[in-house]
Amino acid sequence: YASIYGNTENAAYYLANELSKLGVKDIAMYDVSSTDVSYLISETFRCSHIVLMSATYNLEIYPKMDDYISDMKRLNVSSKTFAIVDNGTWAPTAGKKMREAVETLKSCKICENTTTVKSAVNGSNAAALADLAKEIAAEIQG
């Protein structure tokens, strides 16, 4: 996740908790602002499902998340399932841009439930995050 004020981080913890309640094990979370991209890439190759969560920053993907996604493209990450969650109060655009970037990766799937958190987790987006957790859990548990 890429969080500016902590709200995207809170959404990441909320989603991880929902996944755990659904029986998903071995959940790993990383703050792209404080984790070297080499560790993120290593985990990307290890995992089958990756959730990209980013705040919108100047109508773009938060720079550290953008760096991570760029590295995935350069290293030809393939055959993964991605879930996308963006956060923004006025004009959340990070989700659309992350989707466009992931669509360039070979044999990768994007979950149908792309979610936007407007500032902070609340009733409506909490339900959307719970729906996303159900979709991810169903994919993982087959």
Which residue ranges define each predicted feature?
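FMN-binding flavodoxin-like domain, especially the glycine-rich phosphate-binding loop
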Residues: 13-33, 40-142
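Glycine-rich phosphate/diphosphate-binding loop of Rossmann-like nucleotide-binding domains
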Residues: 6-9
